[in-house]
């Protein structure tokens, strides 16, 4: 009979940051007797989850993708945002063979160069500075027909903040004397990640057919009309931008289409609609054979050009477990499943030997403030069963509530989400202690602790750059180390498990066994 394993469990409370100020702080306002008691009585520390400590630009807020890559890698992983900033600054970007090749090919054939992406200074899925550099690259290489298709943010940025970005690009095109913003649409449609194909179809039709629900002469006018309809940036309906006498910007065979998002999860669906011959998410009214370039690799099975292919990470936590014949479980809801699998494994899609995965469906609601507990009860039930099963050496779990409900900007809902999490943590901690296992509770970045923007008075729907908690629950006598960061978590887990830390992991253990 095999011996029951005592698992090392990592619970990631997505969007659960630490903030001393109590105003507009859903985590402080919520009744959290369990987390309060753990913080008071167990070894704990605060760790950095943003900026240079996670490979992002200085003071840049953290995000789930970046957070999980650092958590799993055990070393600071320089993110695409930072890498692209450097490439643009030293002008290597302007010589990227994939980007220049696509532009030159379209230009030489008299075709258009279409640039699409999230027009945002948020830096989570994209950055407008990168899009600006792409416009400049196309113009410098002599492209005449340059069309920008702007997906509007309002989620990683304030809800109504797109106007200054659109103005900047309209001014740029005016200065160049060519090109224009050809369409605007909210990210709710263009960047779905939950197979809501009816949304993606609206964006696809706007791009391929130059057909939308609305039309305006300029991008700013189109945005102002959306605000008048009470649509915030994220939800702006498909709007064609085309003044009298301007050519139609519908996509044609042979055009170049460059997708400037660098984060994969919300880029995949619309990319598949363009690239996959066997695409069946919706019946495409127009199938165009464009020269499609992904800025980064959105998925290994999407067969199209990639401007910046992934650098592979060796000996991530998951791979190291497999090499040491350990069993592991990854478990989360739909919204964060990719994060505890693909991203935690350093961008590797397939599971490692001995790695099981459990996916709990996120509730099908329009926005998560309508169901702030999400699917946490079912997730907890499955997680507790796995802890007690004796099957796993380690378990990685993500609860999405703090982040997904924090993004709605609805304070009361975020408070309910945090209270639901407190009940879940109680169940998990009890289960871990009952089998003699160990538990680390942390977060990948902040969100719910800051629900209103003090500067603008608007709802604060974005992540924060605040530290996150790290708590140890277990029978070892440990002392916490200050000054940690997300990439210290994997080495911390390995040291608590009594395992060797691979040399590729440069993070340091944050709990020292006394």
Swiss-Prot record:
GO CC terms: cytosol
| TM region positions | none
Q: What class of enzyme is it?
A: isomerase
For activity, the cofactor(s) needed are: Mn(2+)
**Highest taxon of the lineage:** Bacteria
Spell out the InterPro entries in the cross-references: Alkaline_phosphatase_core_sf, BPG-indep_PGM_N, Metalloenzyme, PGAM_B_sf, Pgm_bpd_ind
**What are the binding positions for Mn(2+) 2 in this chain?**
14, 64, 444-445
Cofactor note (record) = Binds 2 manganese ions per subunit.
Which parts of the sequence bind substrate? 125, 155-156, 187, 193, 263-266, 336
Query: Where does the secretion signal sit in this chain?
Result: none
Active site positions, chain numbering? 64 (phosphoserine intermediate)
**Where does this protein hold Mn(2+) 1?**
403, 407, 463
Q: What function is annotated for this protein? A: Catalyzes the interconversion of 2-phosphoglycerate and 3-phosphoglycerate.
Which family does the record assign?
Belongs to the BPG-independent phosphoglycerate mutase family.
Q: Per its record, how is this protein called by name?
A: 2,3-bisphosphoglycerate-independent phosphoglycerate mutase
Q: Which gene encodes it?
A: gpmI
């Amino acid at each position: 009979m095999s011996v029951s394993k005592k698992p090392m469990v990592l619970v990631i409370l997505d969007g659960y940051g630490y903030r001393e100020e109590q105003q507009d702080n859903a985590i402080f306002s919520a009744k959290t007797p369990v987390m309060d008691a753990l913080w008071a009585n167990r070894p704990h520390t605060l760790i950095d989850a943003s900026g240079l400590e996670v490979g992002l630009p200085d003071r840049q807020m953290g995000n789930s993708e970046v957070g999980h890559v650092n958590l799993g890698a055990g070393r600071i992983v320089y993110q695409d945002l930072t890498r692209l900033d450097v490439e643009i600054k030293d002008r290597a970007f302007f010589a990227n063979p994939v980007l220049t090749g696509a532009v030159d090919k379209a230009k030489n054939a008299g075709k258009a160069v279409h640039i699409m992406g999230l027009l945002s200074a948020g830096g989570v899925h994209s950055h407008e500075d990168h899009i600006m550099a792409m416009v400049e690259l196309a113009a410098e290489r002599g492209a005449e027909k340059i069309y920008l298709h702007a997906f509007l943010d309002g989620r990683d940025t304030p809800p109504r903040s797109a106007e200054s970005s659109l103005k900047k690009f309209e001014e740029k095109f005016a200065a160049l004397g060519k090109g224009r913003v050809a369409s605007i649409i909210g990210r709710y449609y263009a960047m779905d990640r939950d197979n809501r194909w009816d949304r993606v179809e609206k964006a696809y039709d706007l791009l391929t057919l130059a057909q939308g629900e609305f039309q305006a002469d300029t991008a700013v006018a189109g945005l102002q009309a959306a605000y008048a309809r009470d649509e915030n940036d994220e939800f702006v309906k498909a709007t064609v931008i085309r003044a009298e006498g301007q050519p139609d910007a519908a996509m044609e065979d042979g055009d170049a289409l460059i997708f400037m998002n660098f984060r994969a999860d919300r880029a995949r669906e619309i990319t598949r609609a363009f690239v996959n011959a066997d695409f069946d998410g919706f019946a495409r009214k127009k199938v165009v054979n464009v020269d499609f370039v992904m800025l980064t690799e959105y998925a290994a099975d999407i067969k199209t050009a990639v401007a910046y292919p992934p650098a592979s990470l060796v000996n991530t936590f998951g791979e190291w477990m497999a090499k040491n014949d350990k069993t592991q479980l990854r478990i989360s809801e739909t919204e964060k499943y990719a994060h505890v699998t693909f991203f935690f494994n350093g961008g590797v899609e397939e599971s490692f030997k001995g790695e099981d995965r459990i996916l709990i469906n996120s509730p099908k609601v329009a926005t998560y403030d309508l169901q702030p507990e999400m699917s946490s009860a079912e997730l907890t039930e499955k997680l507790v069963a796995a802890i007690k099963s004796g099957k796993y050496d380690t378990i990685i779990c993500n609860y999405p509530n703090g982040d997904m409900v924090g993004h709605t900007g609805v304070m009361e809902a975020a408070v309910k989400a945090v209270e639901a999490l407190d009940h879940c943590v109680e169940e998990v901690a009890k289960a871990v202690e009952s089998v003699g296992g160990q538990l680390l509770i942390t977060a990948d970045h902040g969100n719910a602790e800051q629900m209103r923007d003090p500067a603008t008075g608007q709802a604060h729907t974005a992540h924060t750059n605040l530290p996150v908690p790290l708590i140890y629950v277990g029978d070892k006598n440990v002392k916490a180390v200050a000054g940690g960061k997300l990439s210290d978590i994997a080495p911390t887990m390995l040291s608590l498990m009594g395992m060797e830390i691979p040399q590729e992991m440069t993070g340091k253990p944050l709990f020292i066994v006394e």
